[in-house]
């Protein structure tokens, strides 16, 4: 097996996947597939529940969802349909919100209009281990169109995955019959989950050897940390299972262990100056979505290679 020429550690097998991380080929991830219509500040207020959220619960965390008018900067051409109205219609179609957040803003006059995110589930898309989630992004200040992404939620570890581009994104501009187009887009994402399930099941059927797992972990580290500097944690740390059921060699388990360890933090690390520290959880919503999406694309690229 040939050696990856740009890996930080010689002798690792080249899995034949390429990644545009810092413009250096290593593993395959399409950056343009990770472009979001919204950008979120770090440490955005987040609320996630085991039961559908009420309007009062949502309003306490993300008041911009209930804006009664667009921001004053919007022109008359801006078709204003509040996210709360769209949410109510989605509820009528069986979609319920289980997580909400909105970005922090420096200007108070934009707080009630700023970008926000809702993760919704349909009653038909929940099973014992995972739930399909539609990730809805929007704003009322012109900084974001309506955008819907596909995601999964693992109950065992409370991890919110993002399904790369296995399921197509849907974007709805603030023009015309916005609510109808958003509902149509939600069903489009919903019907695309079969492809995500096929990818997940195929990952479960693929066994990785130690070298392949290490290469996957190395590429995952490059997605989060500057490739020009040594990562503060090692491949073996992010491959370490946090529960017995995840101690498996299949690609799905390797992917989930890597995702959880990179996003939840809590690992003993060494800074560039040699000081000991503990990795922090990924709290920025935009950063979280981008990293999770990139990790899915990484795993799915390996799945396709191993098929």
Enumerate the predicted regions with their spans.
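Acidic/proline-rich low-complexity IDRs
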Residues: 11-17, 86, 297, 304
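Generic low-complexity, intrinsically disordered sequence content enriched
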Residues: 19, 32, 57, 91-94, ...
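Intrinsically disordered, low-complexity regions enriched in serine/threonine
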Residues: 34-40, 124-128, 140-143, 152-307
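Intrinsically disordered, low-complexity segments enriched in serine/proline and basic residues
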Residues: 2-4, 23
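Amphipathic, interaction-prone secondary-structure segments
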Residues: 80-88, 92-145
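Feature for intrinsically disordered/low-complexity regulatory segments and propeptides
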Residues: 34-84, 88, 98, 109-110, ...
């Amino acid at each position: 097996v040939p050696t990856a020429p740009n890996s930080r550690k010689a002798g690792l097998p080249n899995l034949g996947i390429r990644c545009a991380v810092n413009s250096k080929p290593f593993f395959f991830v399409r950056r343009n597939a990770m472009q979001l219509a919204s950008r979120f500040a770090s440490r955005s207020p987040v609320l996630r529940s085991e039961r559908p959220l009420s309007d009062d619960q949502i309003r306490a965390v993300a008041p911009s969802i209930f804006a009664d008018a667009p921001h004053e900067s919007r022109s008359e051409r801006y078709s204003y349909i509040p996210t709360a109205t769209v949410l109510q219609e989605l509820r009528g179609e069986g979609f319920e919100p289980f997580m909400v957040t909105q970005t922090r803003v420096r200007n108070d006059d934009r707080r009630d209009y700023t970008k926000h995110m809702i993760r919704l589930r349909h009653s038909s898309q929940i099973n014992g281990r995972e739930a399909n989630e539609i990730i809805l992004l929007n704003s009322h200040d012109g900084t974001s169109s309506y955008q819907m992404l596909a995601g999964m939620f693992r109950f065992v570890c409370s991890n919110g995955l993002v399904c790369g581009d296995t399921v197509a994104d849907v974007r709805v501009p603030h023009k015309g019959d916005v609510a109808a187009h958003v509902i149509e887009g939600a069903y489009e994402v919903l019907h695309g989950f079969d492809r995500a399930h096929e990818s997940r099941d195929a990952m479960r059927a693929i066994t990785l050897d130690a070298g392949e797992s290490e290469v996957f972990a190395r590429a995952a580290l490059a997605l989060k940390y500057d490739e020009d500097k040594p990562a503060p944690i090692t491949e073996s740390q992010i491959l370490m299972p946090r529960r017995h059921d995840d101690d498996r060699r299949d690609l799905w388990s390797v992917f989930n262990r890597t995702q959880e360890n990179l996003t939840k933090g809590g690992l003993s690390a060494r800074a560039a100056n040699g000081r000991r520290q503990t990795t922090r959880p990924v709290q920025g919503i935009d950063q979280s979505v981008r990293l999770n999406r990139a990790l899915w694309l990484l795993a799915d690229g390996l799945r396709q290679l191993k098929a």
